[in-house]
Amino acid sequence: VSDSQNSQDGLDPE
């Protein structure tokens, strides 16, 4: 998963 918003948390990237 390449999320830049929720990269700190383990949440799904929006």
From Swiss-Prot:
It is found in: Plastid, Chloroplast; Plastid, Amyloplast. It comes from the Eukaryota. GO terms for biological process: starch biosynthetic process. Activated by 3'phosphoglycerate, inhibited by orthophosphate. Allosteric regulation. Belongs to the bacterial/plant glucose-1-phosphate adenylyltransferase family. Pathway: Glycan biosynthesis; starch biosynthesis. Coiled coil: none annotated. Transmembrane segments: none annotated. GO terms for cellular component: amyloplast; chloroplast. This is Glucose-1-phosphate adenylyltransferase small subunit. It comes from Spinacia oleracea (Spinach).
